[in-house]
């Protein structure tokens, strides 16, 4: 047998469009007049610059702003969390193996904060307030400010305390004598 006998000629051998691999979805008509699309080519400078000047350009800008405002899930969740005025600080109790969190934004004054702390550690402690001349309480409330200094709760005005407090510590009265 000669090699020509093994070669078959298909009836539509001139048109290989049916077997051509493309990136189009199956059943999508392809336009042969467009030719193969080239991806990955660099654009020329004039193709990147929008030369629409004047009012038509402003209208396109305004319409694009409207569509951005209608996006689902906008603004991002992280941005929305920043706008919420929450000021959580950790409260450590000397001798306890656990910490608690307190939202300072819920309270308007030191009295409310001390009441909440006593209720939080109910039956365990009594907190001495700075205004008391005799330190009758078992614990003294201290806090660490932005600079890392340990200060007594009640030494500064309430709003300044809320802004500067990083964490709170309920110290035994004997340990807080030098503060």
Curated annotation (Swiss-Prot):
Source organism, top-level taxon: Eukaryota
UniProt xrefs under PROSITE patterns: PB1 (PS51745)
Signal peptide: none
Location of this chain's protein in the cell: Nucleus
Keyword field: Auxin signaling pathway, Nucleus, Repressor, Transcription, Transcription regulation
Similarity annotation: Belongs to the Aux/IAA family.
Protein's name according to its UniProt entry: Auxin-responsive protein IAA15
Organism: Arabidopsis thaliana
